[in-house]
Amino acid sequence: MRNPLLQACAMALIGLTLAGCASTPAPSTIADTTARTPQLSTLNRLIVEAGLGDTLRSQGPFTVFAPSDDAFKAVPAKTLAELGSNKELLKSVLTFHVVPGKTMAADVKNGNAKTVNGANLALGKAGTMVTVEEAVVVQADVAASNGVVHVIDRVLLPPKQ
């Protein structure tokens, strides 16, 4: 290139392209998203206790129906104590909230979805309202690099086995 103006424009374009790439943060994983969301602090603590952090940082994709802190406050103290003392039960309950694949709220259909723990979750949709078992999605489509998180208003308990 002999034209100095053309050279300057090309260099500016390259610089802007590189600057744009550098300023775009990598999306957070589901585990990182729950960890930095204040209303999911109880869920995050339980994910750590159950040893599921690495799973929720893996490639996925996953759809997580994440009970809010208020949802955990509604769980009887006896049930919470049992979850705290039984790691396998805790894992079973938490993985009952996780469905393989990435399902955005707009894509939810009435029917069942198989969870990571092997049980089925009943999903429902009426207009824009999405339900999961008896829970209502109160915040939908929280994007993560390995899936999506939907905040729900209840803790889901898997069927007795």
Residue spans for each PLM region:
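Mature, structured domains of secreted/extracytosolic soluble proteins
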Residues: 2-161
